[in-house]
A protein has these predicted regions:
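A residue-level marker of the well-folded mature domains of exported/periplasmic proteins
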Residues: 3-4, 13, 20-309
Length: 309
């Protein structure tokens, strides 16, 4: 069923006929495993299309730099713009710039703050973040049999995904079947493996006791694993969960270190954003929100995902 939904979501955008187009792409940062897969998905797909050129820029996690890139795309009269926002609270200004220039704009992966008021010729392609943290936390609850102490590693709080995934965690542990779970610590590690390791080291040094780590992404979860191992903690004594199902995360799961992740189809989002941009450039209609489903990954179904992302 999930495969069918995914096929429908992407195929709905794939009716674009051949179109010579120059698309400007501003990525929040290149130095991110998941966003690298997403970016590669865009570029690999564009190579299969006649006359389609992507001009891909690295915003280096700098909001001002990203806005400048968008202004440069507009000045060079690109046919469409794709943005993976550095700060999802800064997207209203980006939408205004694109609208004033009459250039289609597609946000990808990170939900813009103005997602419910996107102007004409603008769209958002991603996965529904209500699913991500919910799938992740429900599986942790199941593994802990509804009782235990958990720590939460949050992504960058300027990103809607970090805020929503964290809300998902709280919503799940408020349900009857999971109300025996208690959050004993919750801090940001900014999506970073290094910061995840540092945060976990600090918690361990403080003598914090917990049964599970619920991370907003795989990178921070892997950092937590590294710190736990360095401290001599046995990995079968703690449940570790992340989101994205990156190759590094799947390798950690195969090694018995990561217990839960959630597959986010980065390449599918990248492809979908290019299709949406091309359709909008042709003057065709695109749904304002195009969602590609998340999928729970555990050791039981790991083999299905090892060739993805």
């Amino acid at each position: 069923m999930k495969k069918l939904i995914l096929t429908m979501a992407v195929s709905a955008l794939m009716s674009t006929s051949a179109l010579a187009a120059n698309i400007g792409v501003s990525m929040a940062q290149f130095d991110d495993n998941f966003l690298t897969v997403l970016r590669n998905g865009m570029q690999d797909y564009a190579k299969t299309l006649d006359g389609v050129t992507l001009q891909v820029e690295d915003a280096q996690n700098d909001v001002a730099k990203q806005q400048s890139q968008i202004q440069n795309f507009i000045a060079s009269k690109v046919d469409a713009i794709i943005v993976n926002p550095v700060d999802t609270d800064a997207t209203a200004a980006m939408s205004k710039l694109a609208t004033a220039a009459g250039i289609p704009l597609v946000y990808v992966n990170r939900e813009p703050v103005n997602v419910n008021e996107l102007p004409a010729k603008q769209a958002f392609v991603a996965s529904n973040e209500v699913e991500s943290g919910t799938l992740e936390t429900k599986e942790v609850c199941k593994l802990l049999k509804g009782k235990g102490k958990i720590v939460v590693m949050m992504g960058e709080l300027s990103n809607q995904a970090a805020r929503q995934r964290t809300k998902d965690i709280h919503d799940v542990i408020a349900t009857d079947e999971c109300k025996g779970l208690t959050i004993v610590e919750e801090q940001t590690a900014n999506w970073s493996r290094t910061q995840g390791a540092d945060l976990m080291t600090n918690w361990l040094s403080a003598g914090l006791e917990f049964d599970a780590v619920i991370s907003n992404n795989d990178e921070m979860a892997i950092g937590a694993i590294q710190a736990l191992k360095a401290a001599g903690r046995k990995m079968d004594s703690v449940v570790i969960a992340g989101v994205d199902a990156t190759q590094d995360a799947l390798a950690a799961m195969a090694a018995g270190d990561l217990d839960v992740t959630v597959f986010q189809n980065a390449a599918g989002q990248g492809k979908g954003s290019v299709d949406a941009a091309l359709k909008l450039a042709k003057g065709e209609k695109v749904e304002a929100k195009v969602y590609i489903p998340f999928e729970l990954v555990t050791p039981d179904n790991l083999s299905k995902y090892q060739s993805k992302n």
